[in-house]
């Protein structure tokens, strides 16, 4: 390996020999970038080897990697190694590097008050799973520990297991098809749809006294995050829903009781672009729609879109832009990171300023009014959509008729403002009064609704937030 530094211990060379390589060279300058990456990987392995030599767990790590066996023992390091790995999102505007790790040019202090002294930050189990198993790993949301891991990240022990074969990739659950009766009555026009644009929504600071009930320990993010991973109680979701999580619902339990109807299964399929994002300044649409194909993307205020994972608002011009909008745009900074993993959508605030989210799906989970706007502080993340919850609501709404299904259209649209919030507690009471905001259209659920409505005998009108 050309990047190996002098005096590299043999065990480090052996472990680096098992490193998984990402496909492609990264285009122009890829050779230099790959060289820097290999040097960093060597440093990461050296640091881990140094820690494990002190505890006698080095042999177990090498055994796990060479045999690729999940039945090996836990390989642990102290979970308080924040001075090297970092356990929270930084509150400074720095570059997110090509490996998905935070890069720092100098010492910075994280949200939990600890001093960061390394040039990159990341969760240790994510770093080593990326190094030895999945080079395309983006986030801890994509990982879950195996059952026999005693020091899994989500258990929040004093030690954390970094055995890459003690973690699995989260798989996207298969949604059961919705059984839809074919109705003979054809509607000539769509019913009115309240998309909350002109209403004055309530406000909340998540989690503000809300404690989601769960039957298992959620894989929560590290300190400095707000998280609500895990399912909530059925009472919070909907008083009339059957007991059990959406994952346990089947086409039989979700289908209409009258089996004499002509029932047709309507299945969910993943689109090429999981969401489309439109940017607005006040009530004016600015720029073209961004179509997201990658499971992780950022919407930021910068001007250098390096790849398909960035929507840079700094590039967009608007002749009608006023001073308030200009000032707000300067504070967007690193903006928001959106993840689509395992049928769930997460929003993580990377900016120094809060973001404000209106997600009817999230609001229903917590028993809030559908139009409630939730403030997400810097360094925090929130689950803003869950495909399984939506599938359960869709199957239930089919029994209630066309209009009930059509009203679910608004659940597939998420609005998000930067820096400035809106609602009853703010001077700006509607989203179109905020200087900078975006609207996400979740294409998979919207296309599913299209197919269900068509099967029910609806007019051939595509679902959108503006329908």
From Swiss-Prot:
Occurrences of domain MH2 (ranges): 274-467
Keyword Metal-binding annotated: yes
Residues modified to Phosphothreonine: 8, 220
GO cellular component, one term: cytoplasm
Modified residues (N6-acetyllysine): 19
Binding-site residues for Zn(2+), renumbered to this chain: 74, 149, 161, 166
Domain of life assignment: Eukaryota
Gene Ontology terms for molecular function: DNA-binding transcription factor activity, RNA polymerase II-specific; double-stranded DNA binding; I-SMAD binding; metal ion binding; RNA polymerase II cis-regulatory region sequence-specific DNA binding; RNA polymerase II-specific DNA-binding transcription factor binding
Domain MH1: 10-176
GO BP, sorted A to Z: activin receptor signaling pathway; anterior/posterior pattern specification; cell fate commitment; intracellular signal transduction; mesoderm formation; odontoblast differentiation; paraxial mesoderm morphogenesis; positive regulation of DNA-templated transcription
Residues bearing PTM Phosphoserine: 240, 245, 250, 255, 458, 460, 464-465, 467
Binding partners and assembly: Monomer; in the absence of TGF-beta. Heterodimer; in the presence of TGF-beta. Forms a heterodimer with co-SMAD, SMAD4, in the nucleus to form the transactivation complex SMAD2/SMAD4. Found in a complex with SMAD3 and TRIM33 upon addition of TGF-beta. Identified in a complex that contains at least ZNF451, SMAD2, SMAD3 and SMAD4. Interacts (via the MH2 domain) with ZFYVE9; may form trimers with the SMAD4 co-SMAD. Interacts with TAZ/WWRT1. Interacts with FOXH1. Interacts with SNW1. Interacts with CREB-binding protein (CBP) and EP300. Interacts with SNON. Interacts with ALK4/ACVR1B.
PANTHER family for this protein: MOTHERS AGAINST DECAPENTAPLEGIC HOMOLOG 2 (PTHR13703:SF42), SMAD (PTHR13703)
Family: Belongs to the dwarfin/SMAD family.
The name this protein goes by in its record: Mothers against decapentaplegic homolog 2
Annotated gene: SMAD2
